[in-house]
Amino acid sequence: MSLPEHVERLLGVPVVGWRPVVGGGWSASVRGVAELADGRSVFAKLGDVPGTIEAIRGECAIYPLLSGPFVPELVAADPAVPVLVVEDLSDATWPPPWSPELLAGLERLFAELAATRAPAGLPSLAGRVRQAGAWELVAADRGPLLTTGVVSEGWLDHALPALVEAQAAAPTAGDRLLHFDLRSDNLCFRDGRVLLVDWNLAVAGDPRWDRLFMVHTIQMEGGPNVRELAPDPDPGVLAWIAGFFAARAGMPPPVGAPRVRGFQRAQLAVVLPWAADVLGLSTP
C-alpha cells in the first residue's frame, strides 16, 4: 500500500493530490503532502527501511502524549505500518537564514520548553544518555574519530580523560520536556509560533540540553557564535554532546541516512573546540 493510500485509509477521505517531499532531514523515510477531497492538506511520512521504521514508530507512540504551542497538530498515526500524519507546514518559514526575529522566536521556544512538564510515559534523559553513549565509546575505539581529521591522537591522549570525567557530571535529572534533536530542519516558524517536528527522541529531563544541541547548528548556518547564544554552557552537557558526535562522525553511515555522518563531522568541528575551551583544554 502506498503512502497516499495509507492516508486515505486512516482519514477516510480521498487524496486528490500528492506532492512528494524530498530533501531536508537525514533519513530516507517516504514523505509527502496530501491534498484531500475535503479541502485540507496534511503532511505524512512512512518508515520502510531500518532506522526510519523505528523512528516513526517511536514518534507514533510519543506524539499523542504531547501538547503545547510548539507541537504541530496530530492528524492520524498507525504505529504498525508505521505512518504518521500531521498538519501541513509547507507555508511556514524554515531556517536558515537566521534573522533577529527568528532568533527571538527561538528564545521564546526555549522558555516554553523549560516551562513544560514532560508528560507521563516519556523516557528519561538519563536513560537515553546511557543508551546512546558518547566519550566512553571513543575510549573503547578511537579509530573512527581519528579518521575524521578533527583531532590528533596526541590531543586525544591528553584530553580524553577530562572529557570522560566532564560528561559523567552532566545533569540529567529533571521533569521538563526535551525534544532532544533540535536543529534547523526540525523546526519552523508560523504565525508567531515555533513548531517542532520529528519528536521520536523526546525525553524528560534538564532543559539545558536542548539549547546546547541547537545553538551550534545556528553558527554552522551563518548565525551568531555559540558563545553569544549560550554564554554559560554546562560543561558536562557540552562535553557529552561533543562526545556524541565524536563517537559517530567517523562511522559508516547508517542505513537510510547516507548524509548524516558528514553533518555530524561539521557539528563536531564546532562543538568540540567549544567544549575544549570551556573545560580549559587545548584546542583540538
Q: Where is each model-derived feature located?
A:
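Short pocket-lining segment of the protein kinase catalytic domain that shapes the ATP-binding cleft
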Residues: L84-D91
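Helix-rich C-terminal or lid/interface subdomains of diverse kinases
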Residues: A204, L212-P284
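Hydrophobic residues embedded in beta-strands of well-ordered beta-sheets
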Residues: S41, P82-L84, V194
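Juxta-kinase regulatory segment immediately upstream of eukaryotic protein kinase catalytic domains
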Residues: M1-P20
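A conserved alpha-helical element in kinase catalytic cores
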Residues: R40-A80, A92-E112, W209, I218
